[in-house]
Amino acid sequence: LENFKAQQAEILAAKNAHPLIFIAGFFLTYVTITGLSIPGAAIMTLIAGALFGLVIGIVVVSFASTIGATLAFLGSRYVLRDWVQSKFGERLKAIDDGLAKDGAFYLFTLRLIPVFPFFVINLLMGLTRIRTWTFFWVSQLGMLAGTIVYVNAGTQISQVESTAGLLSPTLIGSFVLLALFPWAARGLLAVVNSRRGQ
């Protein structure tokens, strides 16, 4: 943890020296990771909270993750369609059925509670008829709650000064929130779906 804090201090110094360039570099890195479906988005989100704080971290991650997801979506639709079809085609029927039944709300539920991995959703949605703009704004809205939870956890990690800090009520609360979020989201969606069915 001490090594992490030492590295964090150096990174923060670089950020403070050239804040706009640093944020732009982080943003492009996040977009690239997401667009190429490389694992690490969750860690990058925590780091964003540690480096930029809650508000800026949320803004950076929200747009970077959505733009990256949309690039993956477009790549699947126009470049990698055959490969995605052969790799994940067995899951496509569930996506098509969900969109046929609930439209864009189905994508919203997948973003809120991912039944499929994040990158698989991006790729498979590219094979559907959903419009690019709809994919973009629904994805951004659906991922926002999770982004807030993860960035908030990152802000707490940045404040840990020693191993004892790992047991601080605030940090523990942040990770409890991370664990409870999918269950809370599932309950909320159940209520929404029940009202929609009335």
Could you tell me what each predicted segment is?
Residues 30-59, 115-122, 146-149:
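Transmembrane helix boundary and interhelical junction motifs in multipass membrane proteins
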Residues 138-143, 166, 170-178:
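Pore-lining and gate-forming transmembrane alpha-helices of multi-pass membrane transport proteins
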Residues 27-31, 47, 58, 62-66, ...:
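Residue-level signature of the transmembrane alpha-helical core
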Residues 1-26, 62, 66-122, 127-133, ...:
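Membrane-interfacial helix-loop-helix
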Residues 147-160:
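Transmembrane alpha-helical segments of integral membrane proteins
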Residues 33, 68, 72, 146, ...:
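Alpha-helical transmembrane segments of multipass membrane proteins
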Residues 45, 49, 76, 125-127, ...:
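Helix-capping/transition residues at the boundaries of transmembrane alpha-helices
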Residues 32-35, 109-112, 172, 176:
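Hydrophobic alpha-helical transmembrane segments of multi-pass membrane proteins
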